[in-house]
Amino acid sequence: MAATTAAVVAEEDTELRDLLVQTLENSGVLNRIKAELRAAVFLALEEQEKVENKTPLVNESLKKFLNTKDGRLVASLVAEFLQFFNLDFTLAVFHPETSTIQGLEGRENLARDLGIIEAEGTVGGPLLLEVIRRCQQKEKGPTSVEGALDLSDGHPPSKSPEGKTSVNSTPSKIPRYKGQGKKKTSGQKSGDKKTSSETSQSEPSVSLSESKSKSSLHSLVHETRIASFLSNSTVDAKDKSALCPDEDDVEGDSFFDDPIPKPEKTYGWRSEPRKQVGGLASLSDKPHLRSGLSSLAGAPSLTDAESKRGSTVLKDLKLVGEKIGSLGLGSGEDEDYVDDFNSASHRSEKSELSIGEEIEEDLSMGVEDVNTSDKLDDLTQDLTVSQLSDVADYLEDVA
């Protein structure tokens, strides 16, 4: 019975549905609903195609920059900075706007690419801070290196006359002497103020050339002083050898039996009568002393003491000559033997004279030579003093 009732209800529902559909179709409501539904479906499909084909909002300049290696490195540094300080909300906006949700490098890869070692103390901060520090050190590096080069050079920068330092000027190797370039007249200072910048650049080279010329002049003066000192010493040696008689001629004379003492080695040496007798031959062979008498024509006269001394010497020599004559040494053979010690001119002039007269003449000449040698000592006394030391070059004993 229940089944029959259910079947009856189902049949009634289908009949009601069919009746409703037929009624709606007849009134046009069902067709209008079907058309609206069909239009809504087509509109939904068209809108879906537009959404799929719609281009997203992209920053073209940022996209080009991120395509380069440096741009990706900068974006990675900024992302690492935000991650280091846990700025998650900023990262949520940063990644979509930059379209860098994937592809950015981590901290380790960034440190390796930048050459930063974590052991250097950079763990306490982001990598961006270490990059800025290194850039600042590189900026300060060239100036400190230039300062180190200036200090290692050892020479301070040369100053121009206007007081400006010239860095490009090379240090001079020429020894600088004290007092150079320190004194300047007021006219030079006023002229320096009026000079242009070009002349101020050329002044260091001019000062170098002036220092070179001054040092060369100083060396030339030094050389001339040494040359004059050497020439004076050689002339003094020659005068000593010319004015002092030869010792070998006196000592090697075998005519006299008695040994003859050596004369004193001074310009104004005096000998005893016996020494004069033994040195007649050597004195007669010295023509340069006789020829020098003419140059002393204008010399002042001898003093009375010297004339008295010469007269006493003449008297002693006359006595010696008389003794020699009394001994019988006036023969022709002895006369010829004495002539062998005289020059040819003396032999021709005195061939007919006796030995006593020859001795007197020679002794008179010897006394005059001695007196003239004393005068030469007075006139030609060397008073030069060495310019290289405080000690006299040489000293002479005047009788």
Swiss-Prot record:
Residues 259-275 have a biased composition (Basic and acidic residues). It is found in: Cytoplasm, Cytoskeleton, Microtubule organizing center, Centrosome; Cytoplasm, Cytoskeleton, Microtubule organizing center, Centrosome, Centriole; Cytoplasm, Cytoskeleton, Cilium basal body. Pfam families: FOP_dimer. The modification Phosphoserine is found at S152, S160, S202, S301, S326, S331. Residues 197-217, 290-302 have a biased composition (Low complexity). The keyword Phosphoprotein applies. One of its GO terms (biological process) is cell projection organization. Residues 163-172 have a biased composition (Polar residues). Residues 175-186 have a biased composition (Basic residues). Keywords: Cell projection, Cilium biogenesis/degradation, Cytoplasm, Cytoskeleton, Phosphoprotein. PROSITE patterns: LISH (PS50896). It comes from the Eukaryota. The keyword Cell division does not apply. GO terms for cellular component: cell projection; centriole; centrosome; nucleus; perinuclear region of cytoplasm. The modification Phosphothreonine is found at T143, T170, T234. Transmembrane segments: none annotated. Residues 70-102 form the LisH domain. GO terms for molecular function: protein homodimerization activity; protein kinase binding; protein tyrosine kinase inhibitor activity. Residues 245-256 have a biased composition (Acidic residues). The modification Phosphotyrosine is found at Y337. Required for anchoring microtubules to the centrosomes. Required for ciliation. Homodimer. Part of a ternary complex that contains CEP350, CEP43 and MAPRE1. Interacts directly with CEP350 and MAPRE1. Interacts with CEP19. Interacts (via N-terminus) with CEP350 (via C-terminus). This is Centrosomal protein 43.
